[in-house]
Regions:
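Active-site cores that bind ATP or allylic diphosphates and position pyrophosphate for catalysis
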Residues: 13-14, 20, 24-189, 199, ...
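A glycine-rich helix N-cap at a beta->alpha junction
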Residues: 1-15, 25
């Protein structure tokens, strides 16, 4: 809401579509486009070969009939097998140079309570299978991903074409935003939170949106920064000063000025009356483009406080 987002229809959860994912998995099985495999994860990796020239081999269970695969898949859902004992794989292209297309796993057995679905499921769709299905259900036209998912796009398209028979949604990739002297990885930021090094995700030292908000950044300054940084498919490093310049430019036009002395030195004006006080009108924002005509009263007396760095008993040449 702080950034202006107001999701129509509420917040969507991927787990709400588990029933549809299961339905579409059965569709692929009946069409001969998916099969239940008995290979372990390590064996599956060995059979798939590598993109360095090692050829793949078909699983001994790749040619099971649709009827047998459907029966096994339903028994997977019923909890008749152990974790890793059975896996549902898409039947695509074992000779593809793209490893993601060499019969990827699309369902695994996992006996774990889900934070929203409870114990309803003991099989779960893999990300590359659930992602395009969820996008299609929600009417997404373009799914924006970071560059590490670029090689996953052919699989994304395969799922869309073979389940929905449409061109949309489409996946597009862009480079992650990296900033100088700043940790951006969620994994490392989580460590800072869990170790108590920071006070939480909204600690002003954190490069999170809630952290930036507590530090004083406005939503509009963040939008300005994102527009200036732009979208690229090349990895780049943005100078943190660019973000700081965005908020500084905005505050220069909107913030009223106040004065503070951090390292004070007392200054006494000997030739100014001790009992006299003069008040001067000072502009709250001297920037002419700010359109702020308000002023405030500032007192001038015999005793003043100045910054220590602004004082020198023996000033250097050209000291001001």
């Amino acid at each position: 809401h702080w950034l202006g987002a107001d999701p129509n229809g509420g917040i969507f959860y991927g787990s709400d579509y588990f029933d549809k994912c299961y339905e579409y998995a059965e569709k692929l099985i009946l069409e001969g486009k998916a099969y239940v495999d008995d290979l372990t994860r390590d064996e599956m990796r060995e059979y798939r070969g590598s993109d360095a020239g090692k050829p793949s081999r078909p699983s001994p269970w790749r040619d099971r009939t649709p009827e047998e695969n459907l029966d096994l898949f339903r028994r997977m859902r019923a909890g008749e097998f152990k974790e890793g004992e059975k896996t549902l794989r898409a039947k695509i292209d074992l000779a593809s140079p793209n490893m993601n297309m060499r019969d990827p796993a699309i369902y695994r057995i996992k006996y774990a309570e889900h934070h929203r679905q409870g114990n309803k499921w003991c099989i779960y769709p893999m990300y590359d299978f659930a992602h395009p299905i969820q996008d299609a259900i929600e009417g997404i036209t373009h799914s924006m991903c970071s560059l590490e998912f670029e090689n996953h796009r052919p699989l994304y398209n395969w799922v869309i074409e073979n389940i929905f028979g449409t061109e949309f949604p489409k996946q597009r990739e862009f480079a992650r935003l990296n900033m100088t002297n700043t940790v951006m990885s969620k994994r490392y930021l989580r460590e800072l939170v869990e170790m108590g090094i920071v006070d939480g995700w909204d600690d002003p030292r954190m490069p999170t949106l809630c952290g930036l908000r507590r530090r004083g950044y406005t939503a509009s300054s963040i939008f300005t920064f994102v527009r200036e940084a732009g979208i690229s498919k090349s990895d780049n490093l943005i100078d943190m000063r660019q973000l700081e310049a965005c908020i500084r430019s905005e505050l220069d036009l909107t913030a009223q000025r106040r004065i503070a002395v951090l390292d004070p030195v007392k200054l006494v004006v000997d030739n100014y009356p001790a009992d006299k006080t003069e008040y001067f009108d000072i502009a709250n924002n001297p920037n002419r483009e700010a359109n702020d005509t308000t002023t405030r009263k500032v007192a001038f007396t015999r005793e003043l406080w100045i910054e220590n760095e602004d004082f020198a008993e023996v000033p250097p040449p050209k000291f001001k």
